[in-house]
A protein has these predicted regions:
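Active-site acidic/histidine proton-transfer and metal-coordination neighborhood
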Residues: 15, 23-114, 204
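Aromatic- and glycine-enriched glycan-recognition loops and surfaces
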Residues: 1, 63, 174-175
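Short beta-strand and adjacent tight-turn residues that come in two discontinuous sequence segments
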Residues: 19, 47, 192
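Catalytic-core regions built around general acid/base machinery
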Residues: 4-11, 67-75, 132, 177, ...
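Histidine-acidic metal/acid-base catalytic patches
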Residues: 41, 101-117, 121-218
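Active-site beta-loop-alpha junctions enriched in small/polar residues
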Residues: 1, 21-24, 50-52, 87-89, ...
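Conserved dinucleotide-binding and phosphotransfer motif residues
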Residues: 12, 78, 185
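N-terminal pre-domain/capping segments
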Residues: 1-44, 138-140, 211-218
Length: 218
């Protein structure tokens, strides 16, 4: 919109870790995207997945990996690095042996493409987030973190509870092991997310609880 984000970031005393964009914008004008990232003082541009895209189609995944390599090379020429941010769609099988994320890991070039790993979404998708983080190794440049569990008080109508995002340390994810892995590979930043299901309907309260956990465990 019309907000002056440069001024707002400076006024709040914040640093910009990464700039998010879509692959189409990057393919149209990599220099413009790189210039915007550099204007905020960050070296990372992140693609947050594809919309209206079939992650279960093997040919489409091979094509996506090639497009990411090309876009990453264009950014690298401008002094900026490309990261791919997962959700749960990348866990779809493209054949009997491989998932979409396998294709991305195996066919993207570490010179041009690395990863911002979201452990919540792979856990939500039923995957072993720690195993994937170990497989990524130093290609995981940023780590996206929140917890997963259920917030309910009193009796439940059924024995099956809906799970959702939670404050760090209040859910059921093995955050200690995930944290140890992230720190062992030297991630550049840990990005705390709180996107809904807040304590007392307050995102500030939820973020404070999670921030206290981070301060204690990092």
């Amino acid at each position: 919109g019309n907000l002056d984000w440069h001024a707002l970031v400076k006024e709040a005393g914040l640093q910009v870790v990464s700039l998010h964009t879509d692959l189409g914008s990057l393919e149209r004008d990599a220099k413009a995207v790189a210039d915007e990232a550099k204007s905020f003082g960050t070296k990372y541009v992140v693609i947050t997945g594809m919309y209206r895209f079939d992650y279960g189609d093997e040919a489409s995944m091979h094509d996506l990996a090639a497009r990411l390599n090309k876009a990453g090379a264009a950014l690298k020429a401008e002094g900026v690095e490309l990261l791919y941010h997962n959700h749960n769609c990348e866990l779809r099988h493209v054949n009997a042996e491989k998932r979409a994320y396998d294709i991305l890991l195996e066919e993207t070039d570490p010179q041009f493409v690395n990863f911002e790993f979201d452990s919540y979404w792979f856990t939500e998708g039923g995957a072993n987030a720690l195993a994937w983080m170990q497989r990524l190794g130093t290609r995981m440049k940023l780590w996206h973190i929140n917890d997963r569990g259920t917030r309910i008080s009193g009796s439940a109508v059924t024995p099956i509870l809906k799970t959702d995002s939670m404050e760090l340390g209040t859910g059921n994810m093995d955050l200690d092991s995930l944290m140890a892995q992230a720190l062992s590979v030297g991630v550049d930043a840990v990005i705390l997310e709180s996107h809904r299901n807040w304590v007392d309907n307050s995102p500030i309260k939820s973020l404070q609880i999670s921030a206290e956990y981070l301060e204690k465990h990092m």
